[in-house]
């Protein structure tokens, strides 16, 4: 008989693999899609005195990514100009950031966010960690390919020159996208062994055997690790997250915490990040925008449900309270509705 955990695990896998991406996305392909008509309407909106932002937002947030690529192609055919550069000149501020993000393919978007996180002085570790820890094998492999295409250098090379120590080792191992895929066979012996190894390498000893932690957490499948973290509690007086806080510090601690949260429940991980981006004074718009853009066709409906469950009010409500104008409108369309 399957345990509840196995059933849940199977469900979460189906959410990740066998359902088409749009099943839990808030943005779906537009039914009466006409790229030529959309391109013409956007051209008119850009030429309008003062720019008709509402039309631009309405069209681009209500089309799938694939459809947006078709619109950009049709626009270039019509005007001999690139849609992205035309919109860059026409828009500004956070709205411009959202709209330009929507025009990139998912891999181009992630690649450009990763590049930005490592450009110039200092690294935006937070963005680097979020993207590298939360993407699937397939997504990471595509990001690596596109990154090289866009920047004529390897993602791994940039990570190596921008990070150091065990944090670098963890990021490089994750960025390869070589984690085992979830199989149908559950290896209870290995689950037990991994749980014990994580404990022996950390809480049980003085100092931490970080390479051991890295190899288990970057090589095993998501479903396997969910069970390992459960089993871990029967060896350790602390759960995995508490153990990380006790054992490591700085960027490495932050990266392990993000990774374990992603493995345990990815939609909840993003719900927490969204909440943190809007709580208190001021908004961390970069994080808010990146999650709304990158998850809108993947799992936004799951994120919304986790958000409401944990914070008592809907994601929609929080965005309404925290943003304004056409920027707000764009985010609310990507959110896809109130709960």
Swiss-Prot record:
GO cellular component, one term: cytoplasm
Pfam families in the record: Annexin
Location in or out of the cell: Secreted, Extracellular space, Extracellular matrix, Basement membrane; Melanosome
Principal cellular location given in the protein's record: secreted
Cross-link for Glycyl lysine isopeptide (Lys-Gly) (interchain with G-Cter in SUMO1), residue positions: 49
Keyword Repeat: yes
Gene Ontology molecular-function annotations: calcium channel activity; calcium ion binding; calcium-dependent phospholipid binding; cytoskeletal protein binding; phosphatidylserine binding; phospholipase inhibitor activity
PROSITE patterns the record matches: ANNEXIN_1, ANNEXIN_2
PTM-bearing positions, type N6-acetyllysine: 49, 152, 227
Residue positions where Phosphotyrosine is found in the record: 24, 199
InterPro entries the UniProt entry points to: Annexin (IPR001464), Annexin_repeat (IPR018502), Annexin_repeat_CS (IPR018252), Annexin_sf (IPR037104), ANX2 (IPR002389)
Repeat recorded as keyword: yes
Domain of life of the organism encoding this protein: Eukaryota
Keywords: Acetylation, Annexin, Basement membrane, Calcium, Calcium/phospholipid-binding, Extracellular matrix, Isopeptide bond, Phosphoprotein, Repeat, Secreted, Ubl conjugation
Note: It may cross-link plasma membrane phospholipids with actin and the cytoskeleton and be involved with exocytosis.
Record text about domains: A pair of annexin repeats may form one binding site for calcium and phospholipid.
Family as reported in the entry's similarity comment: Belongs to the annexin family.
Biological function: Calcium-regulated membrane-binding protein whose affinity for calcium is greatly enhanced by anionic phospholipids. It binds two calcium ions with high affinity. May be involved in heat-stress response. Inhibits PCSK9-enhanced LDLR degradation, probably reduces PCSK9 protein levels via a translational mechanism but also competes with LDLR for binding with PCSK9. Binds to endosomes damaged by phagocytosis of particulate wear debris and participates in endosomal membrane stabilization, thereby limiting NLRP3 inflammasome activation.
Descriptive protein name: Annexin A2
Species of provenance: Bos taurus
Lineage: Eukaryota, Metazoa, Chordata, Craniata, Vertebrata
């Amino acid at each position: 008989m399957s345990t509840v955990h196995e059933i849940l695990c199977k469900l979460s896998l189906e959410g990740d693999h066998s359902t088409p991406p749009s099943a839990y996305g808030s943005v779906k392909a537009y039914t009466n899609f006409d790229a030529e008509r959309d391109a013409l309407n956007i051209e008119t909106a850009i030429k309008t005195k003062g720019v008709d932002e509402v039309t631009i937002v309405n069209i681009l947030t209500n089309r799938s990514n694939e459809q947006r690529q078709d619109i950009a192609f049709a626009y270039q055919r019509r005007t001999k100009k690139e849609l992205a550069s035309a919109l860059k000149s026409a828009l500004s501020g956070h709205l411009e950031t959202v709209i330009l993000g929507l025009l990139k393919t998912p891999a181009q978007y992630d690649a450009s966010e990763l590049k930005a996180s490592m450009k110039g002085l200092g690294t935006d570790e937070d963005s680097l960690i979020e993207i590298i820890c939360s993407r699937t094998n397939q997504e990471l492999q595509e990001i690596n390919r596109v990154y090289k295409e866009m920047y004529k250098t390897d993602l791994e090379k940039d990570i190596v020159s921008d990070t150091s120590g065990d944090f670098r080792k963890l990021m490089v191992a994750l960025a390869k996208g070589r984690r085992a895929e979830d199989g149908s066979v559950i290896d209870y012996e290995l689950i037990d062994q991994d749980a014990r190894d994580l404990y022996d390498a950390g809480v049980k000893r003085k100092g931490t055997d970080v390479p051991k932690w890295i190899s288990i957490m970057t090589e095993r499948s998501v479903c396997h690790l969910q069970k390992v973290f459960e089993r871990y509690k029967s060896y350790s007086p602390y759960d995995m997250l508490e153990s990380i806080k006790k054992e490591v510090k700085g960027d490495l601690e932050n990266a392990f915490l993000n990774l374990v949260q992603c493995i345990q429940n990815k939609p909840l991980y993003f719900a927490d990040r969204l909440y943190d981006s809007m709580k208190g004074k001021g908004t961390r718009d970069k994080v808010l925008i990146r999650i709304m853009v990158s998850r809108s066709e993947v799992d936004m409906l799951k994120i919304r449900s986790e958000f409401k469950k944990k914070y008592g009010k809907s994601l929609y409500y929080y965005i309404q309270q925290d943003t304004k104008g056409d920027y707000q409108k764009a985010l609310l369309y990507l959110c896809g509705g109130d709960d």
